[in-house]
């Protein structure tokens, strides 16, 4: 199955988030609880952790770039050989955990 991780809207009055650091490259396998990406708002740091096992297949927002809340950050799949969709909209949502500091 194909999953997307989107920019979380967890901090009040924040419309966009900046990607600080990806904690894996394309093809990296994450287990539940692994840190996938660190994000930054003007008010807080946000850690995005995997809620289930998955393989990072496509990064849609590079480090240092800002993106609006709700926009997809990356695509992940259950297996490395799974074909990616033609459009991000056809991907499901990946269960993730967010930690705000």
Question: What residues fall within each predicted segment?
Answer:
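Acidic, low-complexity mobile loops and tails
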Residues: 1-35, 47, 88-100
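A generic structural signal for short beta-strands and their flanking turns/coil linkers
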Residues: 1-3, 52-55
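Short, surface-exposed acidic/glycine-rich loop or hinge patches that mediate macromolecular interfaces
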Residues: 10-13, 42, 61-64
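Short, small/polar residue-rich loop motifs at catalytic or cofactor-binding pockets
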Residues: 15-18, 43, 53-54
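Acidic, glycine-anchored pre-beta loop/turn
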Residues: 22-30, 61-67, 80
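Short hydrophobic beta/alpha edge segments that flank linear recognition/processing sites
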Residues: 30-49, 68-87
């Amino acid at each position: 199955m194909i999953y997307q991780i989107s920019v979380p809207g967890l901090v009040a009055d924040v419309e966009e988030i900046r990607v600080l650091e990806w904690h894996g490259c394309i093809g990296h396998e994450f287990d539940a609880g692994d840190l996938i990406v660190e994000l930054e708002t003007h008010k807080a740091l946000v850690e995005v952790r995997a809620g289930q096992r998955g393989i990072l297949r496509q990064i849609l927002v590079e480090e240092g770039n800002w993106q609006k809340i709700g926009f997809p950050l990356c695509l992940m799949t259950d297996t490395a050989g799974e074909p990616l969709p033609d459009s991000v909209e056809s991907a499901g949502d990946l269960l993730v955990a967010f930690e705000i500091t």
